[in-house]
Amino acid sequence: RKPATLRMIGLLPIVRNKAFDMVSDGHEFKVWIPGKNRFVIGRNDAPLTVSKQPLENMRPQDIYDALLIPVIDAQNEIAVVENGYETVLDSRRHRVEQPDYELVVVRRGQKNWFLSRRIVFSRTDMKPHRQLIYNEDGQVRTEAHYEKYTDYDSVSFPAQVVITRPIEGYDITLGMVKLEINKPLTNDQFELEQPAGADVVHLGQEIGGLAAAAGASPQRR
């Protein structure tokens, strides 16, 4: 829900048990991991601390930015279109170089301007098929692939989105079974209560609005 509210529930393959449940208001987030009995609370802008448990590394805002490509921020970003090439497989599974258009986005950082995003458009359909998001050190934070574009209520959207987070060591493949756009949503659809007896983990020290509902003694990272 605009501007940056997200609720996502992940299911395990085959058994279809809940792997995680996450919610974010764009600033703070909560993630419930039933298999580990962990309830993680933090801010989307908290410094990254990589956990050995990949599910604990998930941040709703990272998924949101990969799933819905952000618009160019005219105040803090400069975008330039370049001609480029990407390696694809042809009908015979041979690797070939295919020309594309690449939207290079440079962003104002804390100290200097840096390469923030690279969005790759196919010359065949003029749709974005790949997005690379970088941190200020030049590392790839997110790589997203958008495939199988389909019309949903006259809106073209990829039926498959693959999101990879190489630093944290996890990836998510989203397959659209059903997509409803611009449907009314209620506030309770974005509420995630702390389960009784859950092991609570607070990321960072400053916890505000979303975390107020979690009343257990937290662990901190």
Language model segments and positions:
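Generic beta-strand structural signal
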Residues: 1-2, 24, 121, 151
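Residue-level marker of positions within ordered structural domains that often coincide
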Residues: 13, 67-68, 72, 181, ...
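A charged, solvent-exposed segment within the mature domains of Sec-exported extracytoplasmic proteins
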Residues: 36-109
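Gram-negative outer-membrane assembly/targeting C-terminal domains
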Residues: 189-221
